Regions:
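Alpha-helical adaptor scaffolds
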Residues: 108-114, 133, 137-218
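C-terminal non-catalytic interaction modules
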Residues: 206-265
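Short, solvent-exposed positions on alpha-helices
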Residues: 4, 79-80, 177, 231, ...
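Alpha-helical solenoid scaffolds that mediate protein-protein interactions
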Residues: 64, 71, 93, 131, ...
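Amphipathic helix-loop-helix modules that constitute alpha-helical solenoid scaffolds
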Residues: 3-167
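"A position-specific structural signal for the A-helix of alpha-solenoid helical repeats
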Residues: 84, 88-91, 141, 145, ...
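TPR/TPR-like alpha-solenoid repeats
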Residues: 88, 95, 149-151, 185-189, ...
């Protein structure tokens, strides 16, 4: 367990005779980037649980927002700290609508936006506005989350602006997940971009971890369904399900699979 690991770590430190002191202001500033990345990682694990029956691990997402707020309290003028807090606030504001009452995940196109926490969204947008001039990784991610949160309906989503922010994000943080997000955003810009997305997603698969590949295939399933290719969508969905341990996601994939099977008849 985590408690046992902490106990062993404390015992090892005690045996070593090492002494640790609280870092000074300059040292803390130098470590800020690593701290923000760690908090983001914690939030990501909470946003979609690695395993279990629930889509969300609220313990981890709650811890992440607590840590992000404490960092902003320490560094109120740091645009990346503000961006990370904005990103988490906006995500949490939409959290209650991400599943049905029985825990079935919903897409952004399906959610009831009236359930979103509007006060929290306003706070997140204010933080994002302060962060965006910095042009950093978390600031740009907050901008993307802000555009999603500002759309009154799915149809009103500004995919052009979101695609532009993803392009900027790929320049400062060219991670596979950013490339994936950019492809998904562009796929909503018209039929030619939708066809292009199908090709790009297949090219992207296999470039990172098994967990990431499952996300790629889930996106590909959506793209192929929108293209009217139910058979290809079903194949992609099967690949997305392979090795998935989050039971809520598996229930969602089963629901989509049933829908595809009905359409293919």
């Amino acid at each position: 367990t985590i408690a046992a690991r902490l106990t062993r770590a404390k015992q090892a430190i005690a045996r070593s005779g090492e002494r640790f002191s609280w870092p000074g202001t300059e040292d803390r500033a130098e470590r800020l980037g690593a701290a923000l990345t760690t908090i983001y990682g914690v939030y990501t694990l909470g946003h979609t649980a690695v395993a279990g029956s629930d889509l969300i691990d609220s313990r981890l997402s709650g811890l992440a927002i607590l840590l992000a707020r404490s960092i902003v309290a320490e560094y109120p003028g740091d645009t990346e700290a503000l961006g990370l807090l904005a990103l988490i606030e906006l995500g949490e504001a939409r959290g209650a609508a991400r599943t049905t009452l029985d825990g079935m995940p919903l897409t952004l196109a399906e959610v009831d936006r009236s359930v979103w926490g509007r006060r929290r969204i306003r706070r997140g947008l204010e933080l994002a506005a302060l962060a965006l001039p910095g042009g950093g990784r978390f600031a740009l991610q907050a901008g993307i989350a802000g555009l999603h949160s500002s759309a009154a309906t799915w149809a009103e989503t500004d995919w052009g602006a979101i695609s532009t922010l993803y392009h900027g994000l790929s320049r400062v943080w060219p991670a596979p997940v950013v490339i994936l997000g950019g492809i998904i955003a562009r796929s909503h810009l018209g039929p030619s971009e939708l066809d292009r997305a199908a090709v790009e997603l297949r090219r992207l698969s296999g470039r990172a971890s098994a967990e990431f590949n499952r996300r790629v295939f889930a996106a590909l399933a959506d793209v192929e369904e929108r293209r009217g290719e139910e058979g290809l969508a079903s194949e992609a969905l099967a690949a997305a399900s392979l090795g998935e341990k989050n039971e809520a996601l598996l229930r969602y994939y089963a629901r989509v699979s049933e829908r595809l099977a009905r359409r293919a008849r």
